[in-house]
Amino acid sequence: MRSLVFVQLSLLSWEIFCGERSFVSMKAIFSCMYV
């Protein structure tokens, strides 16, 4: 369970860092990660 929470926090951090607030747009998050 801890790992799941950690993953969710990591995704949230990436959304804030990349300026993407849409949780539905996972592709945008991954794109920002690989840039």
UniProtKB/Swiss-Prot annotation:
Segment forming the signal sequence: 1-18
UniProt keyword terms in alphabetical order: Signal
Gene Ontology CC annotation, any one: fungal-type vacuole
Top-level division of the source organism's lineage: Eukaryota
Keyword Signal part of the UniProt annotation: yes
Name recorded for this polypeptide: Uncharacterized protein YMR272W-B
Organism, as annotated: Saccharomyces cerevisiae (strain ATCC 204508 / S288c)
